[in-house]
Amino acid sequence: ATILVSVAASPLPKRQVLKNLGVPKSTYYRWLRRPRLDDRPGGGPTPWNRLSPPEEQAVLEVARRSPELSCRQLAAWITDNRGFSVSESTVYRILRREGLVKSAEMQLKADKEYHRKTTSPHQMWATDASYFKVIGWGYYYLVTVMDDYSRFVLAHKLQRDMTSDSFIEVVQDAVDKTGMTEVPVADRTSLLSDNGSGYVSRAFGDYLHLVGIRHILATPYHPQTNGKLERYHQTIKQDVNQLPYEVPTDLEAANAAFVSYYNYQRYHMALGNVTPADVLNGRRAGILQRRREVQFQTIERRRRYNRTLRELATASS
């Protein structure tokens, strides 16, 4: 019963919760089909974990106010901000019933990652560039530096080309913002990039040597790839390219707005449905602990609520 409760109330996908608990899917669904004693009074089974009307209204209110959030993101946001826990699947059912479900979103997965996993912020940064078109101006290149562990975008700028000078400018911005040159050389970050001419140039190598940052080059067709940053660039393009831009400053402003949203507001599934800023600043463990507490409190409150409904139905029959 405890496992069924945990799976039903978790904001995470059912498959992920079962994997974390070490319970096979076949076993879970066999348990789910068993009649429960608590369900028998009053005739047919009544879901013990049914949301109360105020909880359903809260789900709809948040969904209508923030239509850009997916069901997964809504479930996490509600758990963090509304004092009760709700699963992604429950959010989906409520929105579908009300005709608020968006068309299926394309799930873009990161490519293979660098073979050595980072375990804390600033162990390794990644940098890459992606092109955007400005009407009448041609192509510009968004150069980004991202922290590998937290996926926090440390620096970004729209550049006219992909020369070493353009790359150095953005990396230096990340160095300045983090105070990386004040860190002992042995503890400084490394930088992962592809083999673009600007990155493999002597000027770029000399710059990294000057600031004490070790350069890691991603070998083609090798697991040392830049998948996280490539995935990020796909995501920002999906958002920013919904509108045409006639001057570079408008595109730069749109990119900056998305970066702020991505870093501080967007729940990232690969990070445990917290934001990159939460991970960068060491808040993830506390947030996940609070969610577990909210989940437990919600389970107990919802169990009492639905038991009362069953007792009232039995008494009136």
Predicted regions located by residue number:
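Short, amphipathic alpha-helical "recognition" segments used to contact nucleic acids or chromatin
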Residues: A1-L12, E56-R65
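Mobile-element integrase/transposase regions
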Residues: F84-S85, S89-M146, F152, D165-R188, ...
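C-terminal domain-tail junction helix/linker
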Residues: H209-I213, Q234-S317
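Basic, flexible linker segments flanking DNA-binding modules
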Residues: L32-M124, P223, L280-R284
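Short coil turns linking two alpha-helices in DNA-binding domains
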Residues: V23-P24, S87
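RNase H-like polynucleotidyl transferase catalytic core
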Residues: R188-N195, H209-K228, Q242-P248
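Acidic/histidine-rich, metal-coordinating catalytic segments
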Residues: V171, M180-V200, Y221, N226, ...
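Short alpha-helical "recognition helix" segments of helix-turn-helix
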Residues: K14-L21, L74, I78
